């Protein structure tokens, strides 16, 4: 974290840095700080401490909600503290925001430095996301939010589960700028394979209503294909080209699979529609329950 603050001091444009405050969300870290923060050339550093670890997506939602209520500002930059979101790219986000004011600006990763295995599964994740939701996701958390959109965003319940997915779901205007992913300043990622899968699924779950309908449509199409295959099998049986017992067994098996697929898909759609009638978690209202304290460092 100290390395990141030092890079912010040196890499962020002076006219931006002079009016910048840093809010660090401490999601109940198990590691105590032993060294003080370095001198910050901006306005101040604040640490928002949470009662428990909720995961980085919910930490982002809480941090944004706190800023929206307590810290008047023109723009908010969301970034990870590991250095992979490079501070010098903040200048790029500000430049793009000046071109398209009123939109959330995301950093679209033009190049990544992770292992081949990670990059392979990341491509798989983007493909599955596109297939299930019909939308493309080419960005992560690194972004710039104008004040006007911040007030909209913290009232979007879906950002509690996944920040980028919540923005897509909310239909708040957003844009992207190609930025190369940086390298970690220190240490290694604590996210394991299971955590990465859960993170990917959480993004898809934000758009579960669209996903459920697309699965139902796919099930109906597959049912049509199965019925066509059954008709072909019955035709072969009628003309005597089918092995005795084979046609009946295959037809009944395909029919059972078709019915199960259709009913499960239909049940999923009804579950989603029922969920939409429930009262949802609104970060702007409920974030206070998780805030332990706020400390101003400098």
For the regions a protein language model found, what residue spans apply to each?
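Hydrophobic helical membrane-anchoring modules
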Residues: 6-7, 165, 169-298
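Short helix-capping segments at alpha-helix termini
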Residues: 12-17, 40-44
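Short glycine/serine/threonine-enriched helix-capping/active-site loop
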Residues: 78-79, 105-108, 177-179
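A conserved acidic beta->alpha catalytic loop
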Residues: 26-35, 83-84
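Short beta-strand/loop segment that forms part of the nucleotide-sugar
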Residues: 16-29, 49
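Short beta-strand-to-loop acidic/aromatic patch adjacent to the donor-nucleotide binding site
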Residues: 72-84
């Amino acid at each position: 974290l100290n390395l990141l603050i030092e890079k912010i001091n040196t890499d962020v444009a002076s006219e931006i840095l002079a009016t910048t405050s840093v809010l660090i969300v401490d999601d109940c870290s198990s590691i105590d700080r032993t060294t003080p923060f370095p001198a910050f050339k901006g306005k101040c550093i604040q640490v928002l401490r949470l009662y428990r670890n909720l995961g980085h997506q919910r930490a982002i939602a809480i941090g944004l909600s706190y800023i929206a209520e307590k810290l008047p500002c023109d723009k908010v930059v969301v970034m990870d503290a590991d250095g992979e979101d490079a501070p010098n790219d903040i200048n790029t986000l500000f430049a793009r925001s000046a071109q398209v004011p009123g939109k959330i600006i995301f950093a679209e990763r033009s190049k990544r430095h992770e292992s081949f295995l990670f990059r392979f599964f990341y491509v798989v994740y983007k493909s599955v996301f596109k297939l299930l939701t019909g939308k493309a996701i080419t960005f992560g958390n690194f972004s710039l939010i104008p004040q006007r959109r911040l007030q909209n965003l913290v009232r979007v319940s879906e950002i509690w589960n996944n920040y980028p997915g919540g923005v897509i779901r909310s239909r708040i205007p957003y844009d992207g700028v190609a930025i190369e992913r940086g390298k970690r300043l220190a240490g290694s990622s604590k996210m394991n394979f299971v955590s990465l899968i859960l993170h990917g699924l959480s993004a898809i779950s934000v758009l579960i209503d669209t996903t459920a309908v697309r699965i139902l449509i796919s099930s109906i199409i597959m049912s049509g294909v199965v019925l066509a295959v059954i008709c072909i099998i019955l035709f072969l049986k009628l003309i005597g080209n089918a092995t005795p017992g084979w046609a009946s067994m295959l037809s009944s098996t395909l029919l059972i699979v078709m019915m199960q697929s259709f009913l499960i898909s239909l049940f999923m759609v009804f579950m989603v529609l029922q969920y939409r009638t429930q009262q949802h978690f609104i970060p702007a209202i409920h974030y206070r329950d998780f805030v332990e304290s706020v400390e101003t460092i400098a």
